[in-house]
């Protein structure tokens, strides 16, 4: 009986054990799926087990069960097969995802991949920009973007939908893409701006006239640019627009944009909470440099930004902002970054205030030691303090973002408090392959070793399960832990794989993981494992299985406060034998309030932290209550400067109350007294005999922080002086060192180089605050070549051209290259001429392109060859075997070489891409049999302005000005008899800031000059308002400065042969920087000259001025004065030229009234009047010598106290109290249309009592585009303008070869029969008159393609033939009747521009000049520079023998605006004389 019961009991026990084994498994359930192509994109739909996976062959797969089963998505029409290139999930709508196709067809799902709808967009998905931009409030609104990029320039085409792509509409074309203003659900939350912001779109668009990144603008539209195609430019800085917008981004409640001006690497970061009020982010004096900032994961109440500090070592500084994103506090120095801008930084998920950061321990030795020593640290108080990670008493260092080997977050997940990482203990972080897996279950306070070796890892079931897979080669097993990583178990896989990805649901609440790898055996088979841990526990956790866990602890181990509360979670205990098993239910934090403390407050608007961080100080004088502060000793109750951080939940009662009002002294609010006159400050130089011509402003660009006005200069004795306050105080940082030359960095306005006569040299990159010496490989050259050449994009790349063997008879020049600002040098070439970097934005792949002249076979008796190389001359290409000179200007490289058919003459060749050169075709009416010199005057983006010397007889030099087409090869005549001097400089100057206005002096008696010599030269000044197409005499004012008549009169506002205004030009200036106009004082010009038949001597000159771009002039002072503009024309200063004085005159109303100011107690001889090159300062500097003591002195004259406020600008097309919209015009056109459009500029009203305070004034808008007229065309090649304004073929010359385009492009289908006209590249006109394309014909052998393209058959053929015939007959009759049958014989009249006169003898179709060639003129002005004679100019080049210190390729409008009129600054290779050198010409050759 007992035996029987024992047997029964045993069987029952076995049965119970069997049931228990079935309920609780020891291993997860693993399901595998194989794929022929590698999965490369995988994502979950939030709160589901639905996964989308994209494979390399373009197929899309979906799984609805966490990856156990997969099916291919074919789409509604089956066209998704092998057509999907990328998957984008909607960040704010968990039901939507988008599959972007390789072509123009794409798909959307709105039900988590169950069904798909196709849509088409007329553009490919963008590759270098975000293809999809999502709306933060309305998930049906999406912007789709496509892009086309060439080098650094991109064209982005944006489209938009408001109904999830049921309909798609074009948005606009831009330079940097478009974004919704509401880029995140939290943006403008609580501001009641729903109606205003609902449809607002912001776009980064090109400058109105300059297609370069430094001119990009940020505009917005509230109706998708329907009512205004251009949009409204945003006032970002102090109520002013900003140019140079690089990027924009939505970061939770912040909208951020970055801007960079030309000439600096410093970025300006602007932040807004509503797109209306913007503030520049203040980094406490720290510079944010180009490509040097990374927006990191941010909170609802602050942004984290890492700023690059050392590009060579890739280290940065971590900053945290206040709640409005305007003031940033430095948290961590020397953060570890990679070259892509990724930063080793991560916030612990869902826990406020805990941050893991890696820093570089040996940051100051990285370059020398060639290896970073990275260490890890953690913060528990939102980055205010950091401490080491510890495993027991050992320091732990973990691999972070820059070396992450998985996807998603690096260390943490929504699993409360669980943190993992791969790393090592010791002094610093070792290689990833040498690391092991470590885990913490208290949010990083303590750590323990988990597994040996590197692993990929993931968290599941809110941390109940941790899974890991080896990341060291191939493996066939996984590891897992169900007790927070204390104990680990392993499970075998079906295949041995190389793991690529381990992931799970984004909220880490699932018990299913997904592992992707490739099989070791084949390498081409790819496996996706679904690993399900549901069976490892048989029960679901109950209340007693959870603990209340404090998320943050202070240094005493107590729960810590952040943002006014403590944070807790109910978390599963590590040893609980259960699973939470609540999929897609995120752990909810528990908040308990704290009393308010110091950490809960931040500085209020218009306050910043003091240096010790303990108080907030005002950034501007405070405004006291009415009736208070009658004297400085009074006090008043005012703001403390603190405010409670928005969103902070601390309890006021019993806590700190830092934001209560405090008693403040009135001395803090009384602003600096304003003055009714300027303030002068003199500095005497007792030991100097003379100022040299070498002085330069290191001007701050618009995106630069700081407000110093730095001037550097040399005395004639080689003493170097620096002033940081515009000459109020001077210092000698290199006292005792004799400096031979100053070479400002042409592309980086904070930098300059100082050269001596030997190998010692110095550089500064911080605006002359510090200098560092370096040793050049050889002394500066003695052949008049540029000593230094600079790279346009890499500020530390240099070419040094120096002298070799000059004491041994074989004196020649060698060129060396440095990529670290002279620390190391490598030989480029021996026996060289000029060498330059030729990298340009319009030349893709030209980053390392260098051009050099070199004597053939390294022998100076041979010809100079022109070579190029893209690998530092490891190999090179010979472009010309006998290149006399070459000049780089904008996008053009222009070469003067000997004519093979006439060795005494030159030919010009031009290249745009730096690879292919084409011979320049000069017009036949410029008959110069022997061409000895060309002066490159101007190249404004789309054309070259060239002076061809006709006569080089000393004292009687002159030539013809010709202009090119857009590729610089085909020229037409613009003006004859333009005067030049013996050095090749031409009396030619473009007006800065205005399109098409230029002034030139011509010789009116060429025949007499040729016979009698220079004594007979009679000069007249002419002006053009349409870029050289039509020239006219300057109209004189009616009265002189004393109100007396000039004795001659003008008719209809035109100058006449006997009565016009004449101005002394460039060739007569003492300082080439003294230009007529200013890039910031739009419309203003000044000059000295006389009224009469011809230009008289300087002794008879008076001072004249125009306010309307040269249309009307007035006499402002009798006698000769020097002038300068300040505050963009708000103040103008003049001082007598070269005669004793102690008084200057200034005007605050654009010259209507002039006030005297005595700047010195003793009379002085003033040599020079200067200010910052952009003419935006309110300080001026007089350079002179005291008459009695003969001492040199500078006098700073400060006008800033004359006005108290800044002018208020409205940037929506409206005028304001302080500004009006001004439109340039042609004096004889009524519609203000120039180059196919009407421009509008903001100009301050002369009566406004305020300052512009604007560093970069620019075109407000293109008011409108105009229809095309005759003025939008010029004569085609081999055609010349007739007296009546029409174009006719030059007798004896053939028409252009129209079929050439077919031969050059074998795929071309058609060509156009040539006409007498070609469209000006600069014009933006549309519709109207078409003169350049009349008859289209098929290319040879392309007749079928041509017919298909044009669809000529049946009825179409009838209309194609009949309509032109009827139209021609109608026009022919109309023209015959109106033109009296006199084709081509039209006189110029006064009724041009009216509709009745459209085809009349006065019609603009025929009266406008023919030779208009484009140039985007906001690129502004061009002054003649001479390659062979710059050493003789007074512009401050190095004179070591006959050398120039450097060459300066022309950049664009910004460089002109920043360095107006300075040949040294503008470019000595942009405006050059391309001629035969003295040493190279035969005895009968003349220069």
From Swiss-Prot:
Signal peptide span: 1-22
Transmembrane region(s): 1357-1377, 1410-1430
Cytoplasmic topological domain residue ranges: 1378-1409
BNR repeats (start-end): 61-71, 378-387, 438-448, 479-489, 721-731, 816-826, 1104-1114, 1145-1155
Subcellular location, record wording: Golgi apparatus, trans-Golgi network membrane; Prevacuolar compartment membrane
Family: Belongs to the VPS10-related sortilin family.
Name by which UniProt lists this protein: Vacuolar protein sorting/targeting protein 10
Species, as recorded: Aspergillus fumigatus (strain ATCC MYA-4609 / CBS 101355 / FGSC A1100 / Af293) (Neosartorya fumigata)
